[in-house]
UniProtKB/Swiss-Prot annotation:
Amino-acid positions noted as binding S-adenosyl 3-(methylsulfanyl)propylamine in the UniProt annotation, renumbered to this chain: 148, 220, 255-256
Family to which this protein belongs: Belongs to the spermidine/spermine synthase family.
Name under which the protein is recorded: Spermine synthase
Keyword Phosphoprotein attributed: yes
Catalytic activities: S-adenosyl 3-(methylsulfanyl)propylamine + spermidine = spermine + S-methyl-5'-thioadenosine + H(+)
Keyword flag Phosphoprotein: yes
Modified residues (N-acetylalanine): 2
Record-annotated PABS domain positions: 122-362
């Protein structure tokens, strides 16, 4: 698959930019590459020069009068030689710019190139909108279930990473996530009844069954998530997903909402409810985002099946999303029963951002 390599080079000059001098000084470098120049001039807004090559590569050079000079270079990400030629061109431009500015260059910024349209996508936004490039080197699994797209990609640092509908869910490196959503080692699960909502990667189930619970019930809607993870995420799930029933656990392939309603109607209660379905929505308009309705429904139903002295664990979102997290905490105050909560900030390796986890419990009856 053909991909495009997008390289950037930024200069912040210590003085106003002499656009004509820069264009003249760089012209020979682009000509050596066989590139044709086209220049657009604004009276008060500087210059835009475009350089095109017969091989399909091109460069845009934007010169702002206040001293900012930006170069964008796009070429085929074809072979090692092509990458070396691009790096050589950028090196020559950087050296020439330093010469032309007579050491008045205040700052030079050269970012790693972005490869767009490649067979392996390595870029994801963080929850708060920053771009992250992962060291992905292999697509291990890529299937569409009736509910979502399921990808498992291999990272050199983090091992296999589960990605659901474009969202990074869990990597084999992320035991910190699993421990945090289980109470960070502060809980005694011995002889306890536990309900897991979601958790198709098997990480939570794998860790809890080691702690000798009475029974763990996991409700996961997507069989294909389980199938992919039991084959390609075994450092996370061990062998617990090989069978849907074990000595102290059962996995139900069902929508959790009808199951929660059934348990509530039957009066069934759990010592722990662990919600591993979804993060707190990024949207700060609960009245416009159906995910908030889903979240409130899950919260209310979970409280109905939680014992009076039980605990409810869930993830929040990125620590920087303070407004969304505050809205979530407001929702906790609107449940059918009064609750209290605490939160913990945890570094989950593959998320590349700090993550908030919540513990919720019912207020003691007077």
């Amino acid at each position: 698959m053909a991909a495009a390599r997008h390289s950037t080079l930024d200069f912040k000059l210590g003085a106003k930019a002499d656009g004509e001098a820069i264009l003249k000084g760089l012209q020979s470098i682009f000509q050596e590459q066989g590139m044709t120049e086209s220049v657009h001039t604004w009276q008060d807004h500087g210059y835009l020069a475009t350089y095109t090559n017969k091989n399909g590569s091109f460069a845009n050079l934007r010169i702002y009068p206040h001293g900012l000079v930006l170069l964008d270079l796009q070429s085929y990400d074809s072979d090692v030689q092509g990458k070396q030629e691009t790096d050589s061109l950028l090196n020559k431009i950087e050296e020439k710019m330093k010469e032309l500015s007579q050491d008045s260059t205040g700052r030079v910024k050269r970012l790693p190139p972005i490869v767009r349209g490649g067979a392996i996508d390595r870029y994801w936004p963080t929850a708060d909108g920053r771009l992250v490039e992962y060291d992905i080197d292999e697509v291990v699994y890529d299937e569409d279930s009736p509910y979502q797209n399921i990808k498992i990609l291999h990272s050199k640092q983090f091992g296999n990473i589960l990605i659901l509908s474009g969202d990074v869910n869990l990597a084999e490196s992320d035991l910190a996530y699993t421990r945090a959503i289980m109470g960070s080692g502060k809980e005694d699960y011995t002889g306890k009844d536990v309900l897991i909502l979601g958790g198709g990667d098997g990480g939570i189930l794998c860790e809890i069954v080691k702690l000798k619970p009475k029974m763990v019930t996991m409700v996961e809607i997507d069989q294909m998530v389980i199938d992919g993870c039991k084959k390609y995420m075994r450092r996370t799930c061990g062998d617990v997903l090989d069978n849907l029933r074990g000595d102290c656990y059962q996995v139900l392939i069902e929508d959790c909402i009808p199951v929660l309603k059934m348990y509530a109607k039957e009066g069934r209660e759990f010592d722990y409810v662990i919600n591993d379905l979804t993060a707190v929505p990024i949207s700060t308009s609960p009245e416009e985002d159906s995910t908030w309705d889903f979240l409130r429904l899950i919260l209310d139903l979970s409280m109905k099946v939680l014992k009076q002295d039980g605990k409810y664990f869930t993830q929040g979102n990125c620590v920087n999303l303070t407004e969304a997290l505050s809205l979530y905490e407001e929702q906790l105050g609107r449940l059918y029963c009064p609750v209290e909560f605490s939160k913990e900030i945890v570094c989950v390796p593959s998320y590349l951002e700090l993550w908030v986890f919540y513990t919720v419990w019912k207020k003691a009856k007077p």
